[in-house]
Each structure stands twice: as structure tokens, then as C-alpha cells.
Amino acid sequence: MAFNPLLSLLKADAIFLGQLSKSSFCATSRAFSVFYFTRFKRSAYVSAPFGIEPHDEKELKTIDDNVHSNNLSWQKIQEHEVIRELYRKAAYELPGLTPYTQSFKKPADSQIFRFESDVQMSSFEKMNPKVVVTFKVTNIPLLEEKQRHVLRLLVGPRYNPEEDLVRISSDKYSSALQNKYHLIKILTSLIEESKRNAEKFSHVPLNTGHWKYKKCDKRMPQEWLADATTLTSKKKTTIGKQSHNTVLERESIATTDE
């Protein structure tokens, strides 16, 4: 079944009216008396006429905010406005983006370096400027086997020997673009150093101790198991004796009461 945003909008209205009917009538009437509502969103404040009473707009706004800060019906109205705004965007703005759709294309082999950054579109908080670059050492052109070996030595624990991948991250700067340029400088310097020191460090073995899986032997010693079985048998006998004694005490109490 295709998604119909207008039908969803009507359903949201029905759910909202059902929830609003459960709230207190006084709080709801107070909320609607201060604001008036259009078809889609809350509009401007309704100000009192000047001939009736002197008023200050700032003072009235602070009073209304204090009144509605702990009002459940007012919170439901604000939540409903956010939902309606999202449905309006899905109904009227998303169809306008269809000419800009692009089909997925697999990255070409010439794209050696892959940059990644987290962008949260639904959050108003500070964006995460961290950028991560991943690449395969064997895919870098113009490098001999000795130079690739030196490059693996230089990256250290950032090297994955199982997939021949290198993963480097940077959050030094407050902008993701600056961190990307910083990673590009690091990559160029790594390639230059691996070319320059290929003969000097070619005999150094590659240490992959950071990637070794430390298998934990969780088997219990047999001596401990034997002690545990004897201990449990002793506990069983003591518990049986205690339960037998409690039964005898209850029987004696019952006979004395009779």
C-alpha cells in the first residue's frame, strides 16, 4: 500500500482529538483562548484591545508561558504541531525532490580512499566533526612491495592484517572539512616516507599483536568442581536438617495450642 501523507495527517488529527478530549476542559479552553489556530499551524498571538485594559506584550507573553509550561494539553498541542509539520513536508516538499534522485553506483577501483563522517540531520546539536578514512594498502598505485611493507609499519595498530585495511580518524579541528584536509596531509606524508625509507626498514618484521584474538580459557578446574559438589551435598544435608527441625517445631506449637 502506497504512503498517503494526507491520510496520515487526518489520522494524526483524529488521534490528537481523542487524546485532547481526555485532558481537562479548563486547561484546553485556556490554551485556545490565548492562541488561534489556522489549518496547518499556530499563528500569531491574539492581543487584547487597547480600550479595555492597558497591557504590555512582553508581560503577557511571560504570563502565558508560565501558565502553559506545565500544562499537559498545551504540550500535546505543541507535539501535534511538530507531527503535522513533518506530514506537510512529506506531502508537499518530498515530491519536489524527485528530479534530484540519483541511482546507486558502486565505487570505481580508482577511488582508493574512502572518507566517512557522521551527519545527524534530525538533531540541532553540534555536528560531529570527526572524519575517518579507510583504504587498502594493495590498491595504492606506484608503490613496490617493500614500500607497502614500510607503510604498514608506519600506520601501526591502525592496520587490519586480515583485510589489508588501514583506518585513520581525525577530530583535531572543529570542522569536518578541515579534518579531511588534515587526513589528506597525513596520507601524503605516509606515502612519501614509505618511498623514502623503503630500503632502510624493509627487514623490520610486521607486528600484528594488536590484532590477535586473545582466546580466554573459561573451563573450570576439576579440583574446584569436586569441592563444589561436596559443598553442595553438605549444604543439602544441612538444609534438610533445618527444614525437619522447623516442621517439628511447628507440630509442637500446634499441640500446645490445642
Curated annotation (Swiss-Prot):
GO terms for biological process: mitochondrial translation. The keyword Glycoprotein does not apply. Keywords: Mitochondrion, Ribonucleoprotein, Ribosomal protein, Transit peptide. One of its GO terms (cellular component) is cytoplasm. InterPro entries: Ribosomal_mS35, Ribosomal_mS35_mit, Ribosomal_mS35_mt. Disulfide bonds: none annotated. It holds the Pfam family MRP-S28. GO terms for molecular function: structural constituent of ribosome. It is found in: Mitochondrion. Residues 1-39 form a transit peptide. It comes from the Eukaryota. The keyword Mitochondrion applies. Transmembrane segments: none annotated. Belongs to the mitochondrion-specific ribosomal protein mS35 family. Component of the mitochondrial small ribosomal subunit (mt-SSU). Mature yeast 74S mitochondrial ribosomes consist of a small (37S) and a large (54S) subunit. The 37S small subunit contains a 15S ribosomal RNA (15S mt-rRNA) and at least 32 different proteins. The 54S large subunit contains a 21S rRNA (21S mt-rRNA) and at least 45 different proteins. Component of the mitochondrial ribosome (mitoribosome), a dedicated translation machinery responsible for the synthesis of mitochondrial genome-encoded proteins, including at least some of the essential transmembrane subunits of the mitochondrial respiratory chain. The mitoribosomes are attached to the mitochondrial inner membrane and translation products are cotranslationally integrated into the membrane. This is Small ribosomal subunit protein mS35.
